Design a protein with these regions (language model features):
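Domain-level signature for soluble enzymes in the chorismate/prephenate branch of the shikimate pathway
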Residues: 1-294
Length: 294
């Protein structure tokens, strides 16, 4: 956040004149929208972004105070568009930081018009992967079609008279659709985790986790050596994702989330040691993990 805007916010927020701007991935009614609305229930303007990269850009350019992006789904795995944008933050100039981790228990619903049997049922590939068999068995005459997101699927169902969608039940009222089946899913728990992005320096006192990004020399055992540093300092790793460098596919960058904060002495020692045993090491923020939204 720019100094000018920060001063303006501080001077006028008490009077409610300048609302906070929160960018989120997807359209109104998406799960990112729901998380943003529940995290900032008052005095915030929620800004829809078509692409995950647009959320990063909005916060980077000070067009938004915060951004909400998905990082991982328990059924679908990592959200690689978010991973790639985070890894790009390893390149100077210093970009964003992760301020919080949020999570949402995903409740998939079948949405449509009760008066019209479906000829097409839309959804994102992850819900279709886990609910598709049930939908095909229940509605054998409907074509099951993939959309870019559940919010886009709901929009298609709203614009096509004989189409339904699998998506967020919160989007039904926005698009004048009925909730045909309130809860779809499998026995597996369906949770999506999100990062709250900002440009705040420093480490919050409530921080419990840190996100690191680094590269390694292209030689056997280099990743093991790096992870042994965390083990040595009793730092628990909670997430690791690797991505090949676009200009050199034989080399990888690693995004590592671990327990601990940059203001803790044992973590500082581990960071200093890891600096020697890795390449381009950077902290993308120490943050707290917020209670899951049900």
């Amino acid at each position: 956040m720019s100094a000018k805007r920060a001063v303006k916010d501080k001077a006028t927020s008490a009077a409610g004149l300048v609302p906070m701007i929160v960018a989120y991935f997807g359209k109104p009614g998406s799960y990112s929208h729901e998380v943003a609305a529940r995290r900032f229930p008052r005095n915030a303007v929620l800004k829809s972004c078509r692409m995950i990269s647009d959320v990063f850009e909005a916060v980077t350019r000070d067009a938004a105070d915060y951004g909400v992006v998905p990082i991982e789904n328990t059924l679908g795995g990592p959200i690689y568009d978010t991973v790639d944008e985070l890894i790009r933050q390893n390149e100077p100039p210093i970009g964003l930081t992760v301020c919080e981790e949020l999570s949402l228990h995903i409740m998939l619903s079948l949405l449509g018009r009760k008066t019209t049997p479906p000829k097409r049922i839309y959804s994102h590939f992850v819900p279709l992967k886990h609910c598709g068999d049930w939908v095909r068995a229940r509605y054998p005459g409907a074509a099951i079609l993939e959309a870019e997101s559940t919010s886009e699927a709901v929009e298609r169902a709203a614009s096509e008279p004989d189409a339904w969608a699998i998506g967020n039940r919160g989007a039904a009222a926005m698009h004048q659709l009925h909730i045909i089946v309130p809860k779809l899913g499998t026995r597996a728990e369906n949770i999506t985790r999100f990062y709250l992005l900002g440009r705040h320096a420093g480490v919050p006192r409530s921080a419990t986790h840190t996100l690191l990004v680094f590269g390694l020399q292209h030689r056997p055992g280099s990743l093991v050596v790096a992870l042994q540093v965390l083990q040595k300092h009793k730092i628990n790793m909670t997430r690791i994702v690797s991505r090949a460098l676009p200009h050199n596919p034989e080399e990888y960058l690693f995004l590592v989330e671990c327990e601990g904060a940059m203001n803790q002495p044992h973590f500082q020692k581990a960071f200093a040691e890891l600096t020697v045993k890795s390449r381009h090491l950077r902290s993308l923020g120490s943050f707290r993990v917020v209670e899951k939204f049900e």
